[in-house]
């Protein structure tokens, strides 16, 4: 049995375009990415030790004939919480190409908080409390710390930075740049290139009424007889919208103090304009 391992990784950051890019890249005929977007194999010690390399390699077997084989565990960039990810990447995949998606810090934090509400992460429901106490919101936004850690293992030429705003504004250019970086035909254009995926603004939160109905026999019948558009209508009515984040001046200043130096470091290391995110530095 031929052993197939990835030769590129989308390392994060969450809520910075990783799902959109994963969706688009896996449509390319010379690229394979498994249906499981985020294996978390190299970051989470429990998965690494219990599942083992045979499980991980099975994910990529269908891509044996593809030039580029990759995965998109967005937590790999969170080097403060998952330091083993960069170590394992450097040890087992020294020639891999890394794509690092980043987003304006305040926007990424807000979007990540909304995603956590939808997925019911155990964190304070109040936005300000969550930002101050749920470490992943801030630590996933320490772009400078993360890039510095990866540059200690990989040369800069093997790391490609993707800006969320540029992916949104000029997807053809950004997508083509990623294809060139991965060494595959850059002329391929997916039919849905301009459509964003996994938008927090489109998400809604499960309510007790929705959960109760979801498990009931009328719901099982409805799933069989109702057309998809009508099912989506009822689901949307039974779920509640995600709350809006409230940025008080005090909270904004707290985040600025936490991330300002790190953001400056990232912009310098990445070779980006120091005024790219003026609100955060």
Predicted regions and their residues:
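Anion-recognition interface
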Residues: 1-281
């Amino acid at each position: 049995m031929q052993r197939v391992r990835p030769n590129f990784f989308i390392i994060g950051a969450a809520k910075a375009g990783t799902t959109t890019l994963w969706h688009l890249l896996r449509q390319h005929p010379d690229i394979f990415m498994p249906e499981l977007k985020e294996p978390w194999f190299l970051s989470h010690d429990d998965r690494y030790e219990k599942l083992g390399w045979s499980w991980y390699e099975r994910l990529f077997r269908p891509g044996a004939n593809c030039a580029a084989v990759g995965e998109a565990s967005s937590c790999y960039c969170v080097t403060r919480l998952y330091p083993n990810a960069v170590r394992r990447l450097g040890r087992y995949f020294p020639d891999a190409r890394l794509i690092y998606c980043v987003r304006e810090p305040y926007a990424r934090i807000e979007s990540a908080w909304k995603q956590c509400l939808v997925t019911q992460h155990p964190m304070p429901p109040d936005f300000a409390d969550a930002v101050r106490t749920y470490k992943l919101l801030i630590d996933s936004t320490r772009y400078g710390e993360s890039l510095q850690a990866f540059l200690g293992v990989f040369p800069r030429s093997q790391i490609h930075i993707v800006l969320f705003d540029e992916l949104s504004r000029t997807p053809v250019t950004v997508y083509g740049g990623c294809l060139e970086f991965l060494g595959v035909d850059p002329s391929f254009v997916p039919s849905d290139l301009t459509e964003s995926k996994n938008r927090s603004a489109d998400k809604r939160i499960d309510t007790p009424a929705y959960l109760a109905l979801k498990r009931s026999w009328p719901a099982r019948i409805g799933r069989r007889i109702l057309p998809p558009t009508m099912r989506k209508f009822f689901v949307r009515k039974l779920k509640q919208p995600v709350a809006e984040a409230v940025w008080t001046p005090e909270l904004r200043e707290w985040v600025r103090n936490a991330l300002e130096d790190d953001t400056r470091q990232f912009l310098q290391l990445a070779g980006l304009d120091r005024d790219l995110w003026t609100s955060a530095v």
